[in-house]
Regions:
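Extreme N-terminal starter segment of soluble prokaryotic enzymes
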Residues: 1-5
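Anion-recognition interface
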Residues: 6-13, 17-149
Length: 150
């Protein structure tokens, strides 16, 4: 099994609907951020990939034929090089509405986990901060214009 579809769109641009649509269209399984609940061991692999370390993509995506959302959308170019026959899908949303949605949902959740007293929540929040918010948006999530420009 190999990746046939790679999503390049950020979370909150319809990626969950896209995941379900791809699966309805016959793509075996579509990797999405929520897959990390079932594969907590993947967190370290994604950290390595985002550092630029070599990653065994076929092992990471074993059983999947598509991927959308974070953490893979950050690496769509590397994935495209590893899977040159895969189709790239870019999901988009009005930037202002997207920013508001992110800040009120997934960023707020990541921040709450990061600030939690519970070690497991802290670890999940730290991972999201490192992989998404700090790496992609330079840790400047409160700077609306900067985030939208990214």
């Amino acid at each position: 099994m190999t990746l046939e579809v790679i999503g390049a769109g950020f979370g909150r641009t319809g990626t969950l609907s896209l995941k379900y649509a791809l699966e309805m269209l016959g793509y075996q399984k579509c990797y999405h951020m929520m897959e990390l609940r079932n594969h907590p061991d993947h967190q370290g692999l994604w950290q390595a990939a985002h550092r630029g370390d070599a990653v065994d993509w076929p092992a990471l995506f074993s059983g999947y034929t598509a991927t959308v959302d974070w953490p893979s959308c950050n690496l769509w170019q590397a994935l495209s090089a590893a899977y040159p026959d895969a189709k790239i899908i870019l999901s988009l949303r009005d930037p202002e509405k997207w920013y508001d949605s992110v800040m009120n949902t997934i960023y707020a959740s990541s921040k709450a986990r990061f600030d939690s007293d519970e070690p497991a929540n802290q670890a999940a929040g730290q991972w999201a901060m490192e992989i998404i918010w700090n790496r992609v948006f330079d840790g400047r999530m409160d700077d609306r214009q900067h985030v939208i420009e990214v």
